[in-house]
Amino acid sequence: MSAIVDIIGREILDSRGNPTVECDVLLESGAMGRASVPSGASTGSREAIELRDGDKGRYLGKGVLRAVENLNTEISEALMGLDAQEQTFVDRTLIELDGTDSKERLGANAMLAASMAVARAAADESGLSLYRYFGGSGPMSMPVPMMNVINGGAHANNTLDLQELMILPVGAASFREALRWGAEVFHMLKKLIHDQGMSTAVGDEGGFAPNVASHEAAIQLILKAITEAGYEPGTQIALGLDCASSEFYRDGKYTLAGEGGVSLSSQEFANLLATWCDKYPIISIEDGMAENDWDGWKLLTDQLGKKVQLVGDDLFVTNTRILREGIQKGVANSILIKINQIGTLTETFAAIEMAKRAGYTAVVSHRSGETEDSTIADIAVATNAMQIKTGSLSRSDRMAKYNQLLRIEEELAEVASYPGLEAFYNLR
């Protein structure tokens, strides 16, 4: 038995300089696991609740001392003596201890830190890499990275409404090659932006935030960077969008400041997205409709769902109950997986499994506020999710995940496969 003998919670800072929760779990054998949790900027209204102190005199109210206190008292007492190898039981204990649907009492940030640290301690004791501890000894696929190279919306202070414009190296032969392609396009894009007299400062997730004239101008800039880096748009490197539409959906309309302030109905916005998909090699759209616009989501899915990956982030918030409803209604064809949206590893894995059984893809994702913790890289490989979204090709908090994936691919050697377009099995 891998008995838990000590749990230590602490307040640390994330990549935006805001407090977050870190947890150490020590086992009787001397094995130790450490984990820290991320935090989002644009959040779905049904996400599990991260506990913040609200004391404006300290970190502008964003301190997490209450969550840390919960870790060091209630959570510690409840998990002490439990077998760290029994992840499902550990997570069920956390869920029952909290007693709320949204994890608002103990805080999803406190609960997730404990859940992840327990898993890391158990892997350490087993002498296994974390991805092998999660996924067993079977064959595993490396994920196709969705690389956020131009930021807008809540992630930037520019004219773009859409939150992320991404490149996807679908034609690469390996993850290592995909990462190289992405880095080369990133640096070419930086040169093009600089040559046009725009800022090359990067945002929270490492992407650029230039003041371009329109969304299509941003897309065309990326396509030029792909071409000038020596790659073929579409066949080698495809495009993806994260609209984060809930951020500009008001009173039943999608108001696009970056498109001259036009206000569009759900059908009109779906038509606009469809037009872009016809003109450009866009194969993935995240949150193409607002989280509460289920009729709009159905319109979009019926219109594009057979040829474009439609990812529900704010829509599903990594929650199996909401995902099940979406599957039943034929809404979207993919789910974004953010571990802090749901608050435990067990629930995270359940969402991935439910999606795959329904023929939906699962995209494992970071948050805009990250740490050096690279657990999501191991999760993406262990679950054969085949897609990961973990930022651009700058900022060490993003590189931590990419570099971990390089190590995993090296360790797997010839057993590692890179799926490319096969990762998009939801497209028919």
UniProtKB/Swiss-Prot annotation:
Keywords: Cytoplasm, Glycolysis, Lyase, Magnesium, Metal-binding, Secreted. Its cofactor is Mg(2+). Signal peptide: none annotated. The keyword Zinc does not apply. Pathway: Carbohydrate degradation; glycolysis; pyruvate from D-glyceraldehyde 3-phosphate: step 4/5. Mg(2+) binds at D242, E286, D313. (2R)-2-phosphoglycerate binds at Q163, K338, R367, S368, K389. It is found in: Cytoplasm; Secreted; Cell surface. SMART domains: Enolase_C, Enolase_N. Belongs to the enolase family. PANTHER family: ENOLASE. This is Enolase. It comes from Bordetella pertussis (strain Tohama I / ATCC BAA-589 / NCTC 13251). The gene is eno.
